[in-house]
Amino acid sequence: TTMYKLFRTLLLPVAALFAFTAATAQNVSWKSSVEHREGDVYRIVLEASIPAPYHMYDMGPYEGGPNATAIVFTPGDGVTLEGGVEQLSTPERHYDKTFEMEIGTFAGKARFAQQVKLAAAKATVKAAIEWMICDEVSCMPPDDTELTVELTARPGTAAANSTAAVS
């Protein structure tokens, strides 16, 4: 029938477009940078770009609540972690009716950092990141990624003069 053909021709591609949009909305993108602090101390900064209209949860933790953002740094040879992961961005805090608790969220961008001490001229640190994003209606399934951050000692520092082997 004509109505069926119209439905098949117009509505199915539109429905497929909405399904594709929902599937790609999860695309939080992550980038890393390295800042020299002093001597052999550096700060690895991770930045998330969060697509509108979604928000991403802060590092919590939230028992019985949303999946908080979790970042685990694994240092390679010639580098050690100094302290824990810090949130550089300030989350917006509000009471969430769904989870019945106060939670912190980021919209647009979120920045996190880990301080490290370099004992070799070059080293790598892996960052395993897990997060979840939601809008006002629903949440996407939790997602994860892993970044590898390359560190190179600044000239004139003890690490730059090190002959320690890095694998």
Placement of each model-derived feature along the sequence:
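Extracellular/lumen-exposed scaffold segments
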Residues: 23-167
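Short, Lys/Arg-enriched N-terminal segments with co-localized hydrophobic residues
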Residues: 1-2
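Bacterial N-terminal signal peptides
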Residues: 10-19
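Short hydrophobic helices that act as membrane-entry/anchoring signals
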Residues: 5-8
